[in-house]
Amino acid sequence: MEIRGHQYTSAQGIATVSNTTPVEIIAGVAGKTLYLNYISISISDAAAASGELTDGSGGTAFWKQELIATGLEGPTSMMLNYGEYGLALTEDNGLFGTTTDAGLDYTVTALGYYK
């Protein structure tokens, strides 16, 4: 990936999150910072629960969505766009997803780069 004339290693991941145990979406790399450019979230099965994307396993949640099962009609999706430079996670950390209830299923597709 090229940003303003500099080459960086691209990072991408896709994972289904359906558990309270953190699921790794993009692995962290020792000594590198993961910058996230785009994240697509597709919610296919909802329960009254929250979904979170975190900076590392058990780290700080930078995206959290509470869902109420009643009133959710069919699948829903969200797109997070952090632009050309991206959202920086903590050095060495990867992108993880979790839920507060095993009844909530969502799929995350994420694109970024390591610097």
Predicted regions and their residues:
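Beta-sandwich interaction modules
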Residues: 71-94, 100
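C-terminal interaction-tip segments
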Residues: 1-34, 38, 92, 98-115
